[in-house]
UniProtKB/Swiss-Prot annotation:
It comes from Caldanaerobacter subterraneus subsp. tengcongensis (strain DSM 15242 / JCM 11007 / NBRC 100824 / MB4). The keyword Magnesium does not apply. The keyword S-adenosyl-L-methionine does not apply. Disulfide bonds: none annotated. This is 2,3,4,5-tetrahydropyridine-2,6-dicarboxylate N-acetyltransferase.
Amino acid sequence: MINLNTNDNLTNAYEIARYIKEAKKSTPVKAYVQGKIQVEEEEGLKIFGSEDFKILIGELEVVEKVIEQNKDRIKYYHLEYDRRNSAIPLLDITHLDARIEPGAIIRDKVKIGKNAVIMMGAVINIGAEIGENSMIDMNAVIGARGIIGKNVHVGAGAVIAGVLEPPSSVPVVIEDNVMIGANAVILEGVRVGRGAVVAAGSVVIEDVPPNTVVAGVPAKIVKVVDEKTREKTKLMEDLRG
């Protein structure tokens, strides 16, 4: 059995699927309770407040039990929750030397490099890696085990396919200094070479050579990256660090 408390070697679709299957499912909730309730400390339950007002934080079944036991003492209560039977917690981002904007969803077992930028609405799945100085723009999706190099821009709404469902033995790899336009899709197992540019809206189904520009559905090479392209696709360092 996988030890879910260690840094498991989640390098393929089947290991990740087993990790998810064996993980203890969680429905954490927060309850605001008005009333002089009787509640004792127990594992998995945090209690805050005063004599006639309590905030309870814990698993749904534990909090519901407290509310049911005190229903005659409760004037009213409000329950907050944002997930149900979740298998993977969110990443603890407090230690990261990166910019993480509100609304980004980053699951556990993700690696994020120094000065990376994760914008609002971006979703980064388990096992993904984001390199230094890279930006994951608004509503972009980085699938499970997706590998993003350094100084990469993944445009708004772009999708980097993961290794899960359909299972893939090879993750998507975006090498350093790549620019991916808005709403582009990079399919399973594709490698985008260093310095390449993927035009907005493209669907990339095969490897992209370094320093080339691809566009279209499916994406095809349209030219080699030149100075004009470099100027149009350069990163803004002021947005990082």
